[in-house]
Amino acid sequence: MNDLKLLRSKLSTETIEELYKNLNLLKKELFNLRFQQALGELKNTSRFLLVKKSIARIKTELTKRSNSEEY
């Protein structure tokens, strides 16, 4: 639970460019995880959930920032 608070505070301090960079890295990692799963090489399937949630958190932060700029 404490790690989640640290992650959220880290996301709020990063620039938009850093957020997009991290988002692209996580999307590539998710692609690689899916590829490994298809080949039967994936050992840690729980990593899927962590990567997907991290992507969602970054997208939420980007949406929050874009909405705050509009008003």
Swiss-Prot record:
Superkingdom of this protein's organism: Bacteria
GO cellular component: cytosolic large ribosomal subunit
Keyword Ribonucleoprotein assigned: yes
Any one GO molecular-function label of the UniProt entry: structural constituent of ribosome
InterPro entries named among the record's database cross-references: Ribosomal_protein_uL29, Ribosomal_uL29, Ribosomal_uL29_sf
A biological process from GO: translation
UniProt keyword annotation of Ribonucleoprotein present: yes
Pfam families: Ribosomal_L29
Keywords in alphabetical order: Ribonucleoprotein, Ribosomal protein
Family of this protein: Belongs to the universal ribosomal protein uL29 family.
UniProt protein name: Large ribosomal subunit protein uL29
